[in-house]
Amino acid sequence: MPKGRKPKGPVEKKVIHPYSRKAAYLARDAIKQERKEKLKGEKAQRLNLVGEKLLWFQNQLNPDKPEYTRQDACEITERYLQRFDGELEQIELANSIKGRQGRQHSSREAIIKQTIERERAQYEGNGFEIPDIINAKHLKIFREWNGDLKKLPCIKMRKLSAKGSDSKPSTVSQDTHMEEENEEDKSLDSDSDL
């Protein structure tokens, strides 16, 4: 008995019914892949921002200085927070030229101002994350870093705050705290008199 011929061309895919279980499975799989790609892109963008920040800090380091104090780290951080000042001046200069209609570069200006505001709030609040340049061992590792984003986990970070920049608490804050306690005691005494 002769055997039937096998098709030599590509096999046609069966058409999937749109309401079938297989169609639902493929749709879920596609959504899952899109979500993975989106998260991957967001993570890459975050890593790029951190990498740019670390490269900026690395360029600001003095190669002759073996160790940095907390005050030095605060000064470098202040310079980092003022890194857009020149660009903002250029935008203001372009906008001040007479005869121009509208504000040029307004979206870039808004992004810069939001970034500065957010970073300043972090620095004055809970703390702004910088590479740990105060510790000599971590500083050495940071100086040897070549900008590779895959080696970011090797670099230790430290939160630095403007209010925590002094090593000892100021006496002014203690005096104001004592005055507040005295005012509370006086208000409690006046309430009890009623």
UniProtKB/Swiss-Prot annotation:
Residue ranges, compositional bias (Basic and acidic residues): 185-194
Positions of the UniProt region annotated as Disordered: 160-194
Cellular component GO terms held in the UniProt record: nucleus
Cell compartment(s), UniProt: Nucleus
Domain of life: Eukaryota
First-listed, main subcellular location of the protein, grouped into a coarse class: nucleus
Entry-linked InterPro entries: Tma16, Tma16_sf
GO BP terms: ribosomal large subunit biogenesis
Keyword tags: Nucleus, Ribosome biogenesis
Cysteine-cysteine disulfides: none
Record keyword Nucleus present: yes
Single Gene Ontology MF annotation: preribosome binding
Protein family per UniProt: Belongs to the TMA16 family.
Role: Involved in the biogenesis of the 60S ribosomal subunit in the nucleus.
Quaternary structure and interacting proteins, as annotated: Associates with pre-60S ribosomal particles.
Protein name, UniProt field: Translation machinery-associated protein 16
Organism: Danio rerio (Zebrafish)
